[in-house]
Amino acid sequence: MMKGGMAGLMKQAQQMQEKMQKMQEELANAEVTGQSGGGLVSVVMTGRHDVKRVSIDQSLMSTDADDKEVLEDLIAAALNDAVRKIEQNSQDKMGSMTAGMQLPPGFKMPF
């Protein structure tokens, strides 16, 4: 390989690394909302999986033990929904960055 070709490859690799770092920061700061119970419970979470806010509809607030279990299940479901949305957002964004790469099916990037 000629000297100029290697320098070009190094420059491309550096540009790709910079784009990946920027994309990772955008993903980490992105906020998603997970919901359950038709919106009765919602959770706002960042790409870093930090929970920013939990909202519970007033209709779910009671002292009945059965309602408590339902509420716990709805909170767990909303959290899981938010995590799935973060994963999908990450796959979508990174997929557009790696579209030109010849990666094997199912290959996960280390981020």
From Swiss-Prot:
Belongs to the YbaB/EbfC family. Residues 1-25, 89-111 are annotated as: Disordered. NCBIfam families: DNA_YbaB_EbfC. This is Nucleoid-associated protein PSEEN1789. Homodimer. It comes from the Bacteria. It is found in: Cytoplasm, Nucleoid. GO terms for cellular component: bacterial nucleoid; cytosol. The keyword Ligase does not apply. PANTHER family: NUCLEOID-ASSOCIATED PROTEIN YBAB. It comes from Pseudomonas entomophila (strain L48). Gene3D superfamilies: Nucleoid-associated protein YbaB-like domain. SUPFAM superfamilies: YbaB-like. Keywords: Cytoplasm, DNA-binding. The keyword Ligase does not apply. Binds to DNA and alters its conformation. May be involved in regulation of gene expression, nucleoid organization and DNA protection. Its main location: cytoplasm. Pfam families: YbaB_DNA_bd. GO terms for molecular function: DNA binding. Coiled coil: none annotated. InterPro entries: YbaB-like_sf, YbaB/EbfC.
